[in-house]
Amino acid sequence: MLAIRLRRCGARGRPAYQVVVADSRRKRNGVFLCRVGYYNPRLKSAHIDTVMLRLWTERGAAPTRTVARLLHRHAAGCTAAARNSGSVCPHWQ
């Protein structure tokens, strides 16, 4: 089964994560199929490639609970930012 999950990178004590598509039976930082975006919890920044995300979800990849929560929070923030500025949210480009 394919999973959209977080892959840890960054230095000790300064975590950053890549959002990747991988086989759910693989190690957390093991082989992955595609990098879909990134998340930096220290800066509270994230970037998700929605085209690739949609492509992999159509192929059967399911986000983990953590990634689903991240996507939900990120989408809510982007819609609020776009609503206030009247433009497309830069996070989703």
Swiss-Prot record:
GO cellular component term of the entry, any: small ribosomal subunit
Query: In its UniProt record, which GO terms are filed under biological process?
Result: translation
Decide whether keyword Iron is in the record: no
User: Which Pfam families does this UniProt record tie to the protein?
Assistant: Ribosomal_S16
What cystine pairs are annotated? none
SUPFAM superfamilies assigned to the protein according to its UniProt record, in alphabetical order: Ribosomal protein S16
Alphabetical keyword list: Ribonucleoprotein, Ribosomal protein
Please list the GO terms describing molecular function: structural constituent of ribosome
Fetch the InterPro entries from UniProt: Ribosomal_bS16, Ribosomal_bS16_dom_sf
- What family name appears in the similarity comment? Belongs to the bacterial ribosomal protein bS16 family.
Instruction: Supply the PANTHER family for this chain.
Output: 30S RIBOSOMAL PROTEIN S16, SMALL RIBOSOMAL SUBUNIT PROTEIN BS16M
* Name of protein: Small ribosomal subunit protein bS16
